């Protein structure tokens, strides 16, 4: 079984059960790569360009500090029913004590964010989050349709909601393929934000949209400065960015403006669901400055 926390923590959990674990015929390897711009986002050949440092360790738990160039984060590993051993510069191997092994891996920019929960706690949180998502959101039933394609269409609708929620509803506008893979070198393209997230308020999932709407408010001043540099008033949103909201190097992307109206449209859809004066007050400046440009 595999699950993610689904209630605000970056934790993955795995639960394994096999006689092969008990007999030591199999073990679990956890390896950390260097970053890359290709589709996997991983470079396994540059061992000397990143660091994996053990800060705390015991048989079942280990806290790591990871450094890649100027980026750093913490990783906590909890192997319930097992032993963790470091084998190489960036490689851990986990052996089971018996036929059952539960592993959880927590990641965070701060040390306390890497404090691991048990795999069962993570799976319980995942179930609660999943229940909230499906009970709150909209659904379409096609079971009474006579069209032979109805069942497959319904399956795809359900699957699409799940995939878009887990891959594209984080705290920043998603990159072009969300978290599925590392397309366009991991950059976010704001004209794609609409295609990833506009469905959320239409399907009663506006709370998931709120996560990334906050990014626009936090970077409004940068958008104003971007417009001013070009001789305009208001806020000009860049096309291709990293999380900082600054135009990525390109001979064409900084000239494009097709991403500009998306945020106004999505705020309007979110407001139609909320009908909340506080929401208007919180986002009015964002709408006005974007429209002024």
Task: Give names to the regions the model predicted.
Residues 164, 168-191, 204-265, 271, ...:
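Helix-terminus loop motifs that line ligand-binding clefts
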Residues 12, 156, 192-193, 212:
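Generic hydrophobic, aliphatic-rich segments that mediate packing or membrane embedding
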Residues 51, 71-75, 79-81, 253-257, ...:
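Elongated scaffold/linker segments in the mid-to-C-terminal portions of large proteins
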């Amino acid at each position: 079984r595999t699950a993610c926390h689904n209630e605000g923590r970056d934790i993955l959990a795995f639960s394994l059960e096999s006689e092969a674990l008990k007999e030591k015929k199999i073990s679990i390897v956890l390896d950390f790569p260097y970053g890359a711009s290709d589709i996997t986002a991983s470079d396994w050949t540059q061992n000397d360009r990143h660091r994996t440092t053990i800060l705390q360790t015991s048989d079942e738990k280990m806290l790591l500090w990871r450094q890649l160039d100027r980026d750093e984060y913490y990783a906590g590993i909890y192997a319930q029913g097992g032993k963790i051993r470091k084998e190489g510069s960036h490689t851990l191997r986990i052996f089971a004590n018996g036929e059952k092994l539960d592993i959880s891996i927590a990641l965070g920019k701060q040390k306390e964010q890497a404090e691991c929960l048990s795999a069962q706690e993570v799976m319980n949180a995942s179930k609660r989050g999943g229940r909230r998502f499906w009970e709150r959101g909209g659904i379409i039933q096609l079971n009474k349709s006579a069209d032979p394609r109805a069942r497959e269409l319904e399956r795809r609708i359900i699957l699409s909601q799940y995939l878009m929620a887990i891959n594209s509803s984080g705290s920043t506008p998603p990159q072009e393929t969300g978290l599925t893979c590392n397309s366009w070198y991991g950059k976010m393209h704001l004209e794609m934000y609409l295609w990833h997230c506009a469905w959320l308020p239409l399907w009663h999932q506006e709370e998931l949209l709120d996560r990334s709407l906050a990014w626009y408010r936090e970077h409004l001043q940068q958008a104003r400065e971007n417009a001013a540099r070009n001789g305009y008033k208001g806020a000009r949103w860049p096309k291709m960015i990293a999380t900082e909201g600054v135009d990525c190097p390109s001979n064409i992307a900084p000239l494009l403006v097709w991403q500009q109206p998306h945020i106004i449209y999505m705020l309007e859809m979110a407001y139609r669901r909320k009908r909340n004066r506080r929401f208007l007050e919180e986002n009015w400046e964002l709408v006005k400055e974007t429209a002024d440009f």
